[in-house]
Amino acid sequence: MKTVSIIGGTGYTGSELLRLLSTHEKVEVLNVTSRKEAGKKLTDFHPQVRNLRNYNDLEFQNIAPEDIDTDIVFCATPHGASMAIVPILHEKGINIIDLSGDYRFEDIEMYESWYGLKHTGKIESAVYGLPELHREKIKKSKTIANPGCYPTGAILSMAPLVANDLVDERIIFDSKSGVSGAGVEASQTTHFPNVNENLGAYKITKHRHSPEIGKELEYLGNKKLKVSFTPHLLPVTRGILTTAHSYLKEDVSRADVIEIYEEFYDGEFFVRIFEEGMVSLTGVRGTNFCDIGGFEIDQHGRIVVVSAIDNLVKGASGQAIQNMNIIMGFDEKMGLSVGGMRP
């Protein structure tokens, strides 16, 4: 049995890690850290995992990274905090999955520009952890940068078309997310009366996930792209629906496009291609699946692809566990083989 620590266990991603790991056959959570809640019972803060595994016996701890000695560490800390922790764990040879944005960019200047932070802990061997595109690199690394929630759904929705050079450089992503994507701390934007029965765009052209989407698709297609991304906040708890638009470079049919997607994602358990019907948030809620559908082509040659993920699972904690499974040589589906909660 491999041992796990969760650094930053009071947020939504930490909570979701606990829920999902409760069914994992080959790992046990030993430490869950929180400076603010240190000494408090884990299940008093997260009652949803009461009576599962050893969770009733755990308390939040304030442990320095130097004192952590488990096989795996999930770093569920805010952007900027991870860069002070990950290098210490890396030196100790611990397997790390970092859920912040601190290690998603090889180009440090790009990170500093979009996140407004000075990066002080670069690790050359860190790998961007989108398994469907980088599985072989993930297998060889001990430090994984878990992708952002919006980029996961966006990249997977367009990857087959970009990889096959079927669309021009203009790609537009319109994404709508549940409120949990904003994190556990309440704000004026996420306050219930302001979100309920409402829908609004935010950071219309300057969301920090934009360059993450762009650099991954440019790497895949080996060319410069003009990627545009606009997020919206939905009055729902969890889920991201992404509508991706681009223009085809050649005359292909909808059937051709579907065949390309099915071939590209052949063998990928967590990507489900919908030839008919429409993908939905309820279909992926609580799961590590990315559902992709639409594939409609209009009279101008514009192709529209729609993806759906759970922002807390495939967009965060589930994908982190998927990455852990790959690193440790476990069955990739372990702890993640559940269907959506529909209705």
UniProtKB/Swiss-Prot annotation:
SUPFAM superfamilies: Glyceraldehyde-3-phosphate dehydrogenase-like, C-terminal domain, NAD(P)-binding Rossmann-fold domains. One of its GO terms (cellular component) is cytoplasm. Its main location: cytoplasm. It is found in: Cytoplasm. The active site is at C149. Pfam families: Semialdhyde_dh, Semialdhyde_dhC_1. Keywords: Amino-acid biosynthesis, Arginine biosynthesis, Cytoplasm, NADP, Oxidoreductase. Its EC number is 1.2.1.38. Pathway: Amino-acid biosynthesis; L-arginine biosynthesis; N(2)-acetyl-L-ornithine from L-glutamate: step 3/4. GO terms for biological process: L-arginine biosynthetic process. GO terms for molecular function: N-acetyl-gamma-glutamyl-phosphate reductase activity; NAD binding; NADP+ binding. It catalyses: N-acetyl-L-glutamate 5-semialdehyde + phosphate + NADP(+) = N-acetyl-L-glutamyl 5-phosphate + NADPH + H(+). NCBIfam families: argC. Belongs to the NAGSA dehydrogenase family. Type 1 subfamily. Catalyzes the NADPH-dependent reduction of N-acetyl-5-glutamyl phosphate to yield N-acetyl-L-glutamate 5-semialdehyde. This is N-acetyl-gamma-glutamyl-phosphate reductase. It comes from Methanococcus maripaludis (strain C7 / ATCC BAA-1331).
